[in-house]
Amino acid sequence: MKVSAVETGEISQVSAPRKGMIRGLSIMDFILRIVAAIGTLGSALSTGTTRETLPFTTQFVKFRAVFDDLPTFVFFVTSNSIVCGYLVLSLALSFFHIIRRSSAAKSRILLVFLDTVMFGLLTTGAAAAGTIVYVSHYGNVNANWFPFCGQYNHFCERISGSLIGSFIAVVIFMIIILMSAVSISKH
């Protein structure tokens, strides 16, 4: 009488590394979501609180720069805030994937879909703000847009710095989406 592979335990030895890899991917996913949430929160707060008033004024005009003077920066702050909120809410599902490895394929597919949507939102916000920051640093002579970062140094430094956190979150989203796709393929 032959002994089957299930009775000898050979199948469980083959599937054990796969489960360990999926758990490792889930833990990495959780950590990356926290880092991306911190990056988007920092970008939104840094841009949302940026304002500078020049020390000289005229009788009727006060020279100031505030982030909401440009709709692009408003969109940047809004997109970073939405993505940060999503990342905080998705931490619960990511933690669920760490605890319960089985029957999580459907929720992983949902997360990949929502991650892709948030990736697009974050990328468009960061790219639009990056364009305005570039024009404010270097100007565009053909369109008669002159650089104003020579006058508003503090404003431009904070806006430029906030782009770093947002673009780091974009890269992290790419990694999260790829890791989720690998994890789904292993199920």
From Swiss-Prot:
Alphabetized UniProt keyword annotations: Cell membrane, Membrane, Transmembrane, Transmembrane helix
GO (cellular component) term, any one: plasma membrane
Subcellular location: Cell membrane
Intervals, Cytoplasmic compartment: 1-24, 94-108, 185-187
Domain of life: Eukaryota
Segments in the Extracellular topological domain: 46-72, 130-163
Membrane topology label: Multi-pass membrane protein
InterPro entries, per database record: CASP/CASPL, CASP_dom, CASPL
Membrane-crossing segments per the record: 25-45, 73-93, 109-129, 164-184
Name of one Pfam family that matches: CASP_dom
Major subcellular location class: membrane
Quaternary structure (record): Homodimer and heterodimers.
Family recorded in the similarity comment: Belongs to the Casparian strip membrane proteins (CASP) family.
UniProt protein name: CASP-like protein 2
Taxon lineage: Eukaryota, Viridiplantae, Streptophyta, Embryophyta, Tracheophyta
